[in-house]
């Protein structure tokens, strides 16, 4: 293997993974939301609206939009909404395994939050594609067309960016509407920071460069392009430009400084944990919150690009209007990342085989070692003869507090 194939080629340094003690949704009928309702039993709260929503890596974003729309609607009763996005990224082919990962993000949605949605600044791009899908119910692994998946992702970046630009043009300008409160000729400068869905970190860099490429077409008068583009830029058809290496190289270089300042802070979790599928873009948002000092982040705009194969995608933006310091303290992200245990690749292969043996089994006791789990971690304890699941919570020294029949992921 060539040195740097994954650390440079994919931009990854570490990857989270799971054994058979953790699961991704596997019931074609029962919602994971119904399982999580056990957490509210002690309070007697059964009046909690909502159910699972999914479309590959886009499900969490759809749930987030639903939650925000509920809070803004006539149906809202004054309570907060809770969005839980989590999954396990696992591939059968050896070449794709380094793009795996796992994780879960929970988001509390309500009024007077330190992060607020920009009004009217949300755009989507959706169409039919078979780039990545899970039609084989006998396997946990997806069916993936790798090259098509990259093409679809970049097509979605283009489509969302153009639609977002059209939305911005219809919104009444207001102070602070662009990066640092200045009027920007290039739309990319609308965002002080950006978070992307991150199948791998190198694709994020290419996607940000793609935004700059689009700006070179729509805003050629920007000083960024007058002084930054080579005199003989390649003449490539727009559709072909997505996979053109010369175009990619030019705009990767042109966007390098902006990327380092505005996007690199979002890659802390993705580069350390890998692809979290539906939680990925929100792990990138968390990375920004935990990497940029609260005082520096306040007043800034964060753009988020969410993508799910099949395909569904959206570009939207948030403004930081309050102190994010409390979030940083509660997340305790850096300590939690540092506390993880590093294991050999052979251990990962063993865990993958363990998961294969466990898939769709009943009367099954998982093999994964719970001694390696941190206190407070939920894990699968048993699957009975009717596929009903029992979970437990790892105590300080031994497991305790069983819950049953569902799925809980952790990073």
Positions of predicted regions on the chain:
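Short beta-strand segments
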Residues: 81-87, 108-110, 120, 197, ...
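C-terminal catalytic subdomain
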Residues: 236-245, 260-342
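Long, repeat-rich segments with strong aromatic
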Residues: 190-207
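Phosphate/pyrophosphate-binding loops at sites that engage ATP/ADP/AMP, CoA/4′-phosphopantetheine
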Residues: 25-28, 160-190, 209-214, 232, ...
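Condensing-enzyme catalytic core mediating Claisen C-C bond formation in acyl metabolism
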Residues: 1-26, 96-179, 224, 228, ...
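Acidic, glycine-rich active-site loops and adjacent beta-strand->loop/helix elements
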Residues: 27-30, 55-61, 84-90, 112, ...
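Conserved catalytic cysteine-centered active-site region
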Residues: 1, 18, 29-80, 214-280
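A generic local secondary-structure boundary/capping motif
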Residues: 70-73, 93-98
């Amino acid at each position: 293997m060539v040195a740097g194939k994954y650390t440079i080629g994919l931009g990854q340094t570490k990857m989270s993974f799971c054994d058979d003690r953790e699961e991704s949704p596997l019931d074609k009928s029962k919602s994971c939301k119904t399982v999580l309702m056990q957490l509210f039993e002690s309070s007697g709260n059964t009046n909690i609206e909502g159910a699972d929503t999914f479309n590959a890596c886009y499900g969490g974003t759809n749930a987030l939009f639903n939650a925000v729309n509920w809070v803004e609607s006539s149906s809202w009763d004054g309570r907060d909404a809770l969005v839980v996005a989590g999954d396990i990224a696992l591939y059968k082919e050896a070449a794709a395994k380094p793009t795996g990962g796992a994780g879960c993000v929970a988001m509390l949605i309500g009024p007077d939050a330190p992060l607020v949605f920009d009004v009217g600044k949300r755009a989507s791009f959706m169409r039919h594609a078979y780039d990545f899908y899970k039609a084989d119910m006998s396997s946990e692994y997806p069916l993936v067309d790798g090259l098509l998946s990259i093409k679809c992702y970049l097509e979605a970046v283009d489509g969302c960016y153009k639609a977002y630009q059209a939305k911005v043009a219809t919104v009444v300008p207001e102070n602070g509407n662009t990066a640092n409160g200045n009027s920007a000729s290039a739309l990319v400068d609308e965002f002080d920071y950006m978070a992307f869905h991150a199948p791998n970190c190198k694709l994020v860099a290419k996607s940000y460069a793609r935004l700059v490429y689009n700006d070179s077409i729509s805003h050629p008068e920007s000083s960024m392009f007058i002084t930054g583009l080579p005199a003989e830029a390649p003449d490539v058809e727009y559709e072909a430009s997505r996979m053109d290496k010369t175009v990619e190289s030019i705009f990767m270089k042109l966007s390098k400084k902006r990327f380092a300042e505005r996007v690199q802070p979002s890659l802390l979790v993705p580069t350390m944990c890998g692809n979290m599928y539906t939680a990925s873009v929100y792990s990138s948002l968390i990375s920004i919150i935990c990497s940029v000092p609260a005082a520096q982040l306040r007043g800034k705009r964060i753009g988020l690009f969410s993508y799910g194969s099949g395909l569904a995608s959206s570009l939207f933006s948030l403004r930081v209007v309050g102190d994010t310091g409390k979030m940083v303290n509660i997340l305790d992200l850096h300590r939690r990342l540092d506390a993880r245990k590093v294991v050999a690749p052979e251990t990962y292969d063993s865990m993958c085989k363990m998961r294969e043996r466990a898939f769709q089994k009943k009367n099954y006791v998982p093999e994964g070692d719970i001694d390696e789990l941190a206190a407070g971690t939920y894990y699968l304890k048993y699957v009975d003869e009717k596929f009903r699941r029992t979970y437990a919570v790892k105590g300080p020294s031994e497991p305790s507090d069983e819950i049953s029949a569902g799925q809980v992921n952790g990073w």
